[in-house]
């Protein structure tokens, strides 16, 4: 029998953060594609759009007027998914019809007044201000809620309803599914190994290097060994950090650089504004020590072969198990092969 080769043969990889397996089918990477294709926007956006609900000085759909902001701008979402004053749900003893109240708040974070510039096109000082805003919002909301979720949906392909570069922060009175699962599995690993899972993982990736995409003094971005999306990345501090609020000034500044380099490589891969959903996971604000936690950011981009061909999580993946064609190592190699200077800045 031919010896096993992970570049040629189907195999499964285990995700210790979710407890789930991913089917890797590298032999399928060369299959022809005649399916749906995305149409990337070629529109050059203005620095200010008078019809945009998020631009500085404009009036939002509710009639509220945005200030003439110069940096980041945060406001409560006009169509928030959560409310702080939700009444208690009635007790239910039916194991098949369980319900509980959900309280919280949802805020919008405009990254800058410039309607045309996404994260990789912003300056390092502007990116540093965004990180500081993530920190202050997390610290403020963490005083009231156990879970604070900072995230960004970039691009229409990821359901973004407004092209003005922005993110969101939702605070929950409960621990959401993904957070609860990561909490439980990191805690189990810590109990067995006596060290945080993702701190150990960073050391493995630093020693290996084959999945590294970006490295700065204090941060490492890798295509994780267990990646599900084609060019998924995991962004991690090199030392033990529980929450984004715990970063030193040096780690914060280094994070701004890592974000610029990583998102520039994404855009450069297919010479387009690369869509993704990203977000931060850190220790919950539950009054516990949480030494098993390690701060990290997930980037989930859907593009697969080009700016027009995306991956769909359907069929087998919805009903059985996540599957990918490119190996994590091949995806990281492709991201390393492009510049970390944005193609619009380099003049390419």
Curated annotation (Swiss-Prot):
Q: Which InterPro entries match?
A: GalP_UDPtransf1, GalP_UDPtransf1_His-AS, GalP_Utransf_C, GalP_Utransf_N, HIT-like_sf
Cofactor remark: Binds 1 zinc ion per subunit. Zinc binding seems to play a structural role.
Keywords (alphabetical) are: Carbohydrate metabolism, Galactose metabolism, Iron, Metal-binding, Nucleotidyltransferase, Transferase, Zinc
| PROSITE patterns (alphabetical) | GAL_P_UDP_TRANSF_I
UniProt binding sites for Zn(2+): 52, 55, 115, 164
Instruction: Give GO MF terms, alphabetically.
Output: UDP-glucose:hexose-1-phosphate uridylyltransferase activity; zinc ion binding
Protein's recorded name? Galactose-1-phosphate uridylyltransferase
GO cellular component, alphabetical, reads:
cytoplasm
What's the top EC group for this one?
Answer: transferase
The UniProt entry annotates the active site at 166
According to its UniProt entry, one GO biological process term is: galactose catabolic process via UDP-galactose, Leloir pathway
The taxonomy runs: Bacteria, Pseudomonadati, Pseudomonadota, Gammaproteobacteria, Enterobacterales
Q: Which cofactor does it need?
A: Zn(2+)
Quickly give the catalysed reaction. alpha-D-galactose 1-phosphate + UDP-alpha-D-glucose = alpha-D-glucose 1-phosphate + UDP-alpha-D-galactose
Question: What EC number is given for this enzyme?
Answer: 2.7.7.12
């Amino acid at each position: 029998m031919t010896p096993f080769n992970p570049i040629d043969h189907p195999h499964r990889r285990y995700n210790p953060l979710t407890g789930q397996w991913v089917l890797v089918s590298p032999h399928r990477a060369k299959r022809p594609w005649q399916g749906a294709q995305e149409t990337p926007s070629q529109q050059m956006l203005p620095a200010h759009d008078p019809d945009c609900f998020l631009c500085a000085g404009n009036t939002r759909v509710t009639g509220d007027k945005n200030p003439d902001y110069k940096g980041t701008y945060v406001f409560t979402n006009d169509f928030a998914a959560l409310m702080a004053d939700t009444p208690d749900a009635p007790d239910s003893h039916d194991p098949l019809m369980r319900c509980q109240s959900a309280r919280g708040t949802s805020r919008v974070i405009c990254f800058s007044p410039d309607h045309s510039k996404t994260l990789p096109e912003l300056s390092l000082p502007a990116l540093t201000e965004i990180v500081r805003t993530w920190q202050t919002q997390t610290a403020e909301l963490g005083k009231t809620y156990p879970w604070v979720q900072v995230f960004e949906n970039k691009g229409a392909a990821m359901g973004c309803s407004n092209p003005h570069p922005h993110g969101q922060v939702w605070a929950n009175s409960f621990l959401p599914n993904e957070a609860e699962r990561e909490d439980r599995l990191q805690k189990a690993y810590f109990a067995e190994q006596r060290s945080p899972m993702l701190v150990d993982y960073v050391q493995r990736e630093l020693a290996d290097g084959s999945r590294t995409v970006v490295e700065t003094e204090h941060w490492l971005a890798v295509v994780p060994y267990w990646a599900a999306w084609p060019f998924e990345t995991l962004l991690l501090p090199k030392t033990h950090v529980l929450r984004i609020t715990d970063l030193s000034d040096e780690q914060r500044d280094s994070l701004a650089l890592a974000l610029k380099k990583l998102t520039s490589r994404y855009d450069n891969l297919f010479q387009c504004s690369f869509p993704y959903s990203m977000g931060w996971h850190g220790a919950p604000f539950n009054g516990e020590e949480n030494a098993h936690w390690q701060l990290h950011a997930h980037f989930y981009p859907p593009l697969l072969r080009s700016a027009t061909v995306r991956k769909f999580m359907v069929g087998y993946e919805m009903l059985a198990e996540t599957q990918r064609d490119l190996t994590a190592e091949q995806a990281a190699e492709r991201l390393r092969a492009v510049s970390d200077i944005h193609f619009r800045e380099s003049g390419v």
